[in-house]
């Protein structure tokens, strides 16, 4: 099951200087520009060389993350992955936490749904958000409490285009949603693009439970995983709703951050 859910954190601006080599056959100018933009947003620096200006180093990081041959060259497979809808958080190997491992210090985390999609009944959105949070909550010593007014730790909503957080949505496809790591202000908040077609899994469109579970993982402090079976894998795909669950990689990551729930099932 591939999961491409979309989220955003405070991404650092970066400059791209060196041209990208490519395999025989060439790429269109649009693909070239898309590749540079993709690497700029999702691979902020090379973990070994720390060369923030080397596009080739960034491309190698991407190829390593997705299990591709590490050539540092653009090819059709790389472009195919770059064109998939995905989350706005940079990629790392296996499970990861945000820099400095931000997390909620209170054992009770509040959440509020401030706006809803037109695609689903309010009661369905409420149920799926609760289910997504409980998937994480049953593994860690946190409790989630819904509030209906005021400021909650996690503010959840649907919006189109620019919506006040410097990360405007881009219409159908591409960026589906974004979320912020635990903290003050926007910290923990999760936003979903209302230009998408959201479903409960019973019709064509983006399965909201999949997206919400991924985004709320970010709201709890989780980064991306390179494990294709993980909820925190950066790309989206419709799997079997009846068998949707956290992977061992997801559980290992969230318990690294918060510890195990006393009644969490043994692994």
Swiss-Prot record:
Gene it is expressed from: MMP7
- This protein is called Matrilysin
GO function terms (MF aspect): endopeptidase activity; metalloendopeptidase activity; metallopeptidase activity; serine-type endopeptidase activity; zinc ion binding
So where does Ca(2+) 2 get bound? 170-171, 173, 175, 193, 196
Q: What does the entry note on its domains?
A: The conserved cysteine present in the cysteine-switch motif binds the catalytic zinc ion, thus inhibiting the enzyme. The dissociation of the cysteine from the zinc ion upon the activation-peptide release activates the enzyme.
Q: Which SUPFAM superfamilies match?
A: Metalloproteases ('zincins'), catalytic domain, PGBD-like
Reactions catalysed, as given in the entry: Cleavage of 14-Ala-|-Leu-15 and 16-Tyr-|-Leu-17 in B chain of insulin. No action on collagen types I, II, IV, V. Cleaves gelatin chain alpha2(I) > alpha1(I)
What this protein needs as a cofactor is: Ca(2+); Zn(2+)
Q: Which amino acid positions bind Ca(2+) 1, per UniProt?
A: 153, 185, 187, 189
How is the co-factor bound, per the entry?
Binds 2 calcium ions per subunit. Binds 2 Zn(2+) ions per subunit.
What organism does the record attribute this protein to? Homo sapiens (Human)
Where this protein primarily resides, as one coarse class? secreted
- The broad enzyme category this protein falls into is hydrolase
